[in-house]
Amino acid sequence: MIANSGHIPAYKAFSQDVSLEAVCDLNASAARDTALRHDIPRWYSDVAAMLEEVHPDLVSVCTPNSTHKGLVAQALKAGANVICEKPLTLHYADTVELYALAEKLGKQLVVCQTSRFQRAYFAARDYIADGVLGNIYYAEIDRIRRRGVPSWGTFHRKAASGGGALADIGIHALDAMLWMLGSPQVSAVSGFTSDRIIHSERGVIYDLKESGAFSGVHTARRFDPAECDVEEFASGSLRTDAGISLNFKVAWAANLSDRNNMMILGDKSGLTLPELKLYGTLGENQTDFSPRLFGLGEYDDRPFAGHYYLIRHVIGVLNGTESLMITPQQVINTAATLEMFYRSSELGREVRRNEIM
């Protein structure tokens, strides 16, 4: 889905800089269908054959999480730069290993943390960096879908995805939050998961858009709730080396309204997102401040707009005109956080960073 709806349309938008040469899917008919739909000249069902025959400069990995490590390494070793869907991996050591390989081979490895590409988030990050909020001590994420369980693909199977709601939609919010905060290292995590609604509810209608398939799906897979062995709901508390406490709630399914909210508190001001608003004082008065923000550009209204801005950014990085803004250390930090979270939820206690190293 994300290849057809996000990556490929974004590449085509920058046809003056990149050309789509081939597509690969283990399902040969799906590869052929994608190639025909997007006028891509070659299609494959064998990754090694594609890499050997096409010699791509850049590869997008848009496969289930469990396959990321192997495919990213294979593409890097074939001489390609790589854009990989999030999360790169759910483990600290695997993520460190991939970035070490990319550095050794002199290639760029970029993870699709596309939620960063929003004007309000850039503004919030600048305010924080400029000290407008003062010393930050608390942050919160509230990312809830009422009924947004992906009923397509393999998101609900641990063997394929490694995790559920947190690894799917929560990782975007977590990455954006840590980035806005200046990328403090997460030192400890306490986590909780639940899957009660998926396994108890029957007959309720889900909409594809609710589950993130804004443009629909091209190769739907029959959804069987009995297969689901990942969390529909995740909550956690993080502690960072900067002294910031970060709490979050993430859900594919919850008996609440949809929401995608963030809150950051400092000793001078606080702010809320996604509609950026600051709360502080001015002189002797309490003050609310709503900056007038404009979009990032012409792709704001596209489905998966963040992929357009990410790929434009990657083109700039490869051309030497931009510095990579999704750095190895940032991605390693979120991978460590995911690993600590899932281990904590299994053990029923807080897990510290040194326990996963």
Question: Which residues are covered by each model-predicted region?
Answer:
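N-terminal Rossmann-like dinucleotide-binding module
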Residues: 1-38
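Active-site loop of classical SDR/Rossmann-like NAD(P)-dependent oxidoreductases
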Residues: 2, 26, 255, 273, ...
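Predominantly a Rossmann-like dinucleotide-binding segment in NAD(P)-dependent oxidoreductases
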Residues: 2-3, 115-225, 348
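Hydrophobic residues in well-ordered beta-strands that form the structural core
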Residues: 4, 44, 84, 109-111, ...
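Conserved SAM-binding strand-loop segment of SAM-dependent methyltransferases
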Residues: 40-47
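Beta-strand-loop-alpha-helix segment that lines the small-molecule cofactor/substrate pocket
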Residues: 51-53, 57-58, 64-65, 69-116, ...
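C-terminal helix-rich "cap/oligomerization" subdomain common to oxidoreductases
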Residues: 58-60, 104-107, 241, 313-357
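Contiguous beta-strand/loop segments that form the cofactor/metal-binding neighborhood of enzyme cores
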Residues: 150, 175-279, 310-321, 339-340, ...
